[in-house]
Amino acid sequence: MDIVSHQKIRRFEAGTFQEIESSVATEYPLTIYVNDQELVTIVCTPEYLEDLVVGFLTSEGIVRGPRDINSVDIIEATGHAKVSANFVNKFNAKYRGKRYITSCCGKSRENFYFQSDASLVNVKQNGNLQLTTDMIFRLMEKFEQNSATFHQTGGVHNAALCSSAEIIYSRMDIGRHNALDKIYGRALQDGTSTEDKAIIFSGRISSEILVKTAKLGCGIILSRSAPTELAINMAEELNITTVGFIRGDRLNVYSGFERIT
């Protein structure tokens, strides 16, 4: 299935209109069924769909990981993903989208907005991953080189899982959560540890993206954009390093300073 379509448009430039062909990101609704029960419809980019399903179900706490999944059958023609699972957390499946505010890590600040997030996120333990600024600049350069669809359409989000030296997985999607779920799903299926890895993200680091990073088990997130105040507060409490505004030869470290040298 094509992830990009080509549309005739009228562009205004230098005082005149001209008709050109423009690349546009494809939008694809995927409905996930777990043991023949409809769970959710995700609007996504139609590639790496099995990775998306596995990553989504695990990050939302519906399953504990690939060991709970017998099979994933993607039916592209109808937009269905049929999952056979030997274990399903029915509580998280039922209350996945219920708004719920609780204090983070036993502190008084109210940070989590969904019940499943509060139960699935733990304080990140100090790992052995540390990054120098030179490493970060090199990783961001490689990340940009892997962002062809973003530059072509301007309509997708990019995410990557990386070590200190290289990008391991790179995924893009029209949904920012989806891009991270695709990475998580691939890492889970490959048995790739995320504890000593970092996330690179193309957009701003919102509290939702910070929670996704925590669910993946990564201790560092890097972005060309900035984090929000709530994301920084959560990062401090969850012991996650946030680095933003990585542009040219400068960057800002907002939390977890000890991991960046």
Curated annotation (Swiss-Prot):
The active site is at 105 (cysteine persulfide intermediate). It holds the Pfam family FdhD-NarQ. One of its GO terms (biological process) is Mo-molybdopterin cofactor biosynthetic process. GO terms for cellular component: cytoplasm. It is found in: Cytoplasm. HAMAP family: FdhD. Required for formate dehydrogenase (FDH) activity. Acts as a sulfur carrier protein that transfers sulfur from IscS to the molybdenum cofactor prior to its insertion into FDH. This is Sulfur carrier protein FdhD. It comes from Listeria monocytogenes serovar 1/2a (strain ATCC BAA-679 / EGD-e). The gene is fdhD.
